[in-house]
């Protein structure tokens, strides 16, 4: 350390001598004081530098050699270092050292370590810049030399990817042969003389619009001709027509060209086609000929001669395989199975029911009064119009006289009418149908009817036969029913009705749902009296004479005439003597009033208790509501079909108003329901039905299945009853579905 100090002091001394020699006049007292201060405050160097380890090692080696070498060598080294410092100070690039006038003095000033580190960083940065500038200036100089040397030479610009300049070899143009077929369609048309329309019709088979357009263009003109220019004025084309005289001339020419025939020739042709009987009248009467042709087309085929009948009968009897069949009309007319249980009710004679023939086997009846005469014929031809296509004997009007039946009743072993010839030469025997239908009944010989306590009545009792529930088209017109009963197992009539009912399945036959509410919109078709007296009366079929004898208070005077439901039913003179009357039943309330008059004390007690219960019912209802929890009240709202409410008070008010409205609308159902709400959803449905019945225009739309907007239906119901606003929308939809009302969601 001391050695280094000594070396540095020696360096300063040498520098001072040099400065004094060069510029002695510039020194003053202040510079000397600063120099003295620098000497006094000089700190020994701690060898902190930013240079590499090699530099530090070299400095140490130099210091060691300096100790061994003489002083002269140290002086020379100091001189070289001084020259280097002078060059650095004179270099304009170095900006890290401040210019205080003397560069050597600045190095001797004591500086803080932090400032010194920053200065070292700046010095290192300048050194690096100098090293980099060496390359910078050399690169610029080389570029400058190149530009100067190559200034007169212009570089060629070439694309990165060169395109191939290979030219495609073009084929030499050759003339086309005119014999080559360009279009096969034109070739076929020209060679085979087919029209353009026919060829296109073949190609465009099935495309009617294109075909019609093609035909239209063909009809308008030849396609070979150039199309005519359209008339700018839009005038329609005019055509020449024949006048009346020209038409007459054309008719004469046509008549002269074609041969004429006389009326006798036409009559011969008609005789050959239709026979001699049909051509007896002349053809001048056009109406008679048309009527004759119409009647001839409607008449059944003629019967064969009487000589052929025995041969036909023998052939029928000799046939071994007889096919038993019935036509559809015969099946519909057959009441032998359905009416088996009602034969005892139908009025008929015992000897008439024993006959097995359809028309010939009927035994003669005794004429009584003006009811049945000897010359009265029983026309049953209308009953067997359905047999005319199969039975060759059904074509003749089957008029059976009562007097002739006695004469022809000797041979009743075989019936010719029941034989039907099949197209395959097979025959069969028809089943007997309804023997009692064409039998006239006399008033004197009428057997007693099944009577009731009221008098001589005939009730429409439900049928208990296995075919019950099947629609009978001969007895009533076709109409949709609510359900069809299909028996799974046919049992005998001797067994009980309960066993048969257990084996029946209900199949819905219409769009009405299987769950039918208590009320339906069909009740609106009834009168008010019928609505009020639905359960208090019974409708029966009675003789008008017996109805007059009954009490007029019990029987209504609006009688209904008995009409045949089927158009093919035969009307008899006894139909006017029967009528259908509504007889009022005994009211149970009147009986209870009579009993109450007998026991006045008990009746008074009952009245008092009922009045007390009716008075206390709203309070009890409110107490029951308040005692229930919110969960139970909300559940009751959901089951009944009302809108959900938030608070308990609103729920109770909604249930109270609903119970009051429904109790006034249906007073008979009061107190039937238990639990929180004393009404059900079905009662709400009934109330909505009553509200909608007040609008006939709305009912007409419902009956015609017109889609009705839901909001319009709700507004209609709300106008009649504001309580509808508290009913849930899903409840209204369910009610509409049950009643068959078509709804839609749009608000149009």
Swiss-Prot record:
GO biological process, one term: DNA replication
Phosphothreonine PTM positions: 72, 113, 319
Biased composition annotated in UniProt, kind: Basic and acidic residues: 76-88, 222-236
Superkingdom as given in the UniProt entry: Eukaryota
Segments of skewed composition (Polar residues): 57-75
Keywords recorded for this protein, A-Z: Cytoplasm, DNA damage, DNA recombination, DNA repair, Nucleus, Phosphoprotein
Keyword Transcription: no
One CC-aspect GO term: cytoplasm
Region (Disordered) location: 50-102, 215-236, 277-303
Extent of Low complexity compositional bias: 277-291
Quaternary structure and interacting proteins, as annotated: Forms a heterodimer with SLX1. Interacts with RAD1; catalytic subunit of the RAD1-RAD10 endonuclease. Interacts with RTT107.
Family: Belongs to the SLX4 family.
Role noted for this protein: Regulatory subunit that interacts with and increases the activity of different structure-specific endonucleases. Has several distinct roles in protecting genome stability by resolving diverse forms of deleterious DNA structures. Component of the SLX1-SLX4 structure-specific endonuclease that resolves DNA secondary structures generated during DNA repair and recombination. Has endonuclease activity towards branched DNA substrates, introducing single-strand cuts in duplex DNA close to junctions with ss-DNA. Has a preference for simple Y, 5'-flap and replication fork-like structures.
Name of this protein: Structure-specific endonuclease subunit SLX4
Phylogenetic classification of the source organism: Eukaryota, Fungi, Dikarya, Ascomycota, Saccharomycotina
């Amino acid at each position: 350390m001391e050695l280094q100090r000594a070396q540095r002091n020696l360096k300063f001394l040498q520098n001072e001598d040099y400065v004094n020699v060069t510029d002695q006049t510039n020194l003053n007292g202040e510079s000397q004081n600063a120099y003295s201060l620098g000497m006094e405050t000089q700190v020994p160097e701690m060898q902190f530098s930013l240079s590499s380890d090699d530099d530090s090692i070299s400095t140490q080696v130099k210091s060691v050699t300096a100790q061994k070498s003489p002083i002269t060598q140290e002086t020379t080294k100091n001189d070289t270092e001084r020259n280097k410092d002078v060059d650095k100070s004179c270099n304009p690039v170095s900006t890290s050292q401040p210019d205080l006038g003397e560069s050597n003095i600045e190095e001797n000033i004591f500086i803080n370590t932090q400032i010194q580190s920053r200065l070292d960083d700046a010095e290192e940065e300048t050194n690096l810049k100098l090293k980099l500038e060496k390359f910078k200036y050399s690169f610029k100089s080389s570029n400058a030399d190149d530009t100067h040397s190559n200034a007169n030479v212009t570089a060629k610009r070439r694309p990165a990817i060169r395109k191939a300049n290979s030219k495609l070899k073009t084929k030499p143009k050759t003339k086309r042969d005119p014999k080559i077929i360009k279009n096969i369609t034109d070739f076929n048309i020209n060679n085979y003389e087919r029209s353009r329309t026919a060829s296109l019709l073949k190609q465009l088979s099935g495309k009617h619009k294109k075909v019609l357009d093609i035909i239209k263009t063909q009809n308008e003109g030849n396609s070979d001709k150039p199309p005519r220019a359209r008339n700018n004025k839009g005038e329609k084309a005019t055509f020449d027509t024949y006048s009346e005289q020209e038409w007459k001339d054309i008719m004469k020419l046509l008549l002269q060209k074609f041969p004429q025939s006389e009326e006798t020739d036409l009559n011969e042709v008609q005789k050959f086609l239709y026979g001699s009987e049909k051509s007896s009248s002349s053809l001048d009467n056009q109406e008679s000929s048309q009527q004759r042709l119409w009647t001839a087309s409607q008449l059944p085929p003629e019967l064969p001669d009487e000589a052929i009948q025995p041969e036909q009968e023998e052939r029928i009897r000799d046939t071994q395989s007889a096919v038993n069949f019935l036509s559809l009309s015969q099946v519909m007319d057959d009441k032998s199975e359905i009416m088996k249980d009602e034969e005892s009710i139908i009025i008929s004679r015992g000897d008439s029911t024993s006959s097995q023939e359809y028309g010939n086997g009927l035994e003669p009846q005794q004429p009584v009064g003006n009811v049945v005469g000897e010359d009265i014929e029983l026309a049953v031809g209308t009953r067997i119009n359905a047999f005319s296509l199969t039975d060759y004997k059904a074509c003749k009007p089957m008029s059976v006289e009562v007097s002739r039946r006695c004469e022809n009743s000797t041979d009743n072993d075989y019936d010719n009418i029941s034989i039907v010839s099949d197209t395959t030469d097979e025959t069969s025997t028809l089943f007997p149908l309804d023997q009692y239908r064409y039998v006239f009944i006399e008033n004197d010989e009428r057997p007693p009817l099944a009577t009731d306590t009221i008098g001589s009545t005939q009730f429409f009792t439900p049928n208990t036969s296995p075919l019950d529930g099947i629609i009978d088209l001969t007895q009533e017109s076709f109409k949709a029913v609510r359900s069809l009963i299909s028996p799974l197992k046919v049992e005998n009539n001797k067994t009980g009705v309960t066993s048969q009912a257990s084996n029946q399945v209900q199949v819905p036959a219409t769009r009405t749902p299987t769950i039918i509410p208590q009320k339906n919109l069909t009740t609106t078709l009834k009168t008010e009296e019928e609505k009020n007296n639905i359960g208090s009366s019974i409708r029966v079929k009675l003789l008008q004479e017996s109805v007059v004898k009954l009490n007029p208070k019990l029987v209504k005077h609006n009688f209904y005439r008995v009409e045949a439901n089927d158009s093919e039913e035969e009307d008899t003179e006894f139909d006017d003597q029967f009528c259908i009357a509504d007889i009022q039943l005994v009211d149970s309330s009147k009986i209870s009033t009579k009993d109450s008059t007998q026991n006045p004390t008990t009746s008074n007690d009952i009245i008092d208790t009922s009045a007390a219960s009716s008075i206390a019912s709203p309070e009890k209802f409110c107490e029951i509501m308040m005692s229930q929890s919110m969960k139970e009240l909300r559940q009751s709202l959901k089951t009944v079909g009302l809108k959900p409410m938030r608070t308990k008070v609103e729920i109770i008010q909604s249930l109270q108003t609903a119970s009051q409205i429904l109790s006034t609308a249906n007073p008979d159902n009061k107190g039937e329901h238990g639990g929180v709400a004393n009404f059900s959803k079905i009662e709400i449905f009934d109330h909505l039905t009553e509200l909608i019945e007040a609008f006939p225009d709305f009912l007409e739309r419902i009956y015609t299945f017109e889609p009705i907007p839901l909001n319009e239906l709700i507004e209609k119901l709300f106008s009649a009853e504001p309580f509808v606003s508290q009913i849930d929308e899903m409840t209204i939809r369910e009610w509409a579905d049950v009643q068959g009302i078509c709804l839609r969601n749009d608000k149009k």
